[in-house]
Amino acid sequence: MKKKELNFTPKRDKNTKIPRPRNAASLVLLKRSGKDVQVLLGKRSDKTRFMPGAWVFPGGVVDKADYTISINTSLNKNIIKKLAVSNNIGTANALAIASIRETVEETGLILGKKSKNVLTVNFEEDNNGIAIMSKLGLEPDLTKLFYLGRAITPTISPIRFHARFFITDAKHLTGKIKTTNELVEIEWISLKSAKKLQMADVTEFMINELLTFNGDILKIKKMLVNRPMFTWKMGKQWITRK
């Protein structure tokens, strides 16, 4: 059955100001299952304001606390150059931390390493991903992250993000999958089958990007010179590579 075409981008009132995109990050989790490569996707609640009912990678907006966390690892300098952060290490690491934190909060899965220090950042919620990791004696492990691409929500939307998509191998994860208020269903699904799900154009684009590498993380790591930026301009998909 052909999947129904849905538009997950809300429309902005033309009389309102174009909002500036907020920094955001997603974590693409991959694992090999026999000859297939599977990706973890979650279905957003129908009650959410942005992309209700869409299947997405875990992720979300960068919080202020993500900028202030002191950890013992950092992103690879070659990845930092690709993130459009003017080589700002602090911003780059905050994006990476956000992707890991959101994954903990939305799925229960943790990409962490033993921490030598107790993280002392004040969190507003007990279920904050970094707070959960800290209680387990863990901190985000940025060395296990690779970079897939980035995307900017088009100007027609009243809610805009500048999202960076990181990748990691599921073998580095701990924890057990659990659904949340944000992701009401979570599944490991083959890359080819994933495209049959209802998803936003940017999610499908990133999955197609993964398929060009057969989901091979090491191949993606070697192709840092050709990473995409996805957006829309004048009603058409606009993709640049750098």
Language model region names:
Residues 1-242:
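N-terminal leader/linker segments that precede catalytic domains of diphosphate-processing enzymes
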